[in-house]
């Protein structure tokens, strides 16, 4: 009997509620196109509530200050190891590719074991810029995982890429921020 895994990739970024000036509020955020290709998922550990994942991520954006090589965050990751990166800044658009290996933390719902379904979630954020300055747009062309790889005893039934806003319930110590809602 194979268990089912759904992979949900979220392109989230932190939103801090602030009392920004009128000029900042009129500023239109830059778009960052992001794609992912999962190479493997392994070492699923229900006791420790974690799993390992290897994947390629690519980002295309105009604002060089975003510097995703330094500012990319994977919030649910216990560890993030960058094994390869390449950046092309020769034109008006920054094209970046990175290969990452992560140990992800997740909550497992195993009450229906061995017939349970699990959803693995991966989110990405920029540690220096929030939704006032950037929005993510998912690259939906092609597969998001290698259909030839498999997890013994598991079936990958889908891979969904979405984007959204992660509203933080803190002002991160900044007195200029309004009280979080």
What is each PLM-predicted segment?
Residues 2, 16-18:
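Generic signature of intrinsically disordered, low-complexity, basic-rich segments
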Residues 4-5, 21-24:
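Terminal, compositionally biased non-globular sequences in eukaryotic proteins
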Residues 23-181:
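Soluble non-transmembrane domains of integral membrane proteins
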Residues 1-9:
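Bacterial N-terminal signal peptides that target proteins for export
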Residues 8-16:
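Bacterial N-terminal signal peptides
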């Amino acid at each position: 009997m194979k268990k089912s895994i759904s992979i949900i990739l979220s392109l989230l970024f932190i939103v801090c509620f602030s009392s920004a000036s009128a000029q900042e509020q009129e500023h239109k955020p830059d778009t960052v196109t992001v794609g992912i290709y999962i190479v493997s998922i392994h070492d699923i550990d229900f006791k420790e509530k974690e799993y390992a994942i290897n994947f390629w991520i690519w980002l295309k954006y105009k604002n060089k200050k975003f510097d995703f090589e330094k500012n990319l965050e994977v919030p649910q990751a216990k560890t993030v190891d960058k094994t390869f990166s390449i950046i092309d800044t020769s034109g008006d658009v920054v094209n970046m590719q990175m290969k990452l290996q992560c140990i992800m933390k997740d909550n497992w719902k195993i009450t229906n074991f061995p017939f349970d379904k699990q959803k693995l979630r991966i989110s990405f954020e920029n540690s220096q810029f929030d939704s006032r300055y950037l929005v993510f747009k998912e690259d939906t062309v092609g597969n998001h995982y290698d259909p030839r790889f498999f997890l013994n005893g598991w079936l990958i039934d889908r891979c969904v890429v979405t984007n959204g806003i992660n509203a933080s319930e803190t002002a991160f110590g900044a007195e200029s921020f309004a009280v979080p809602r």
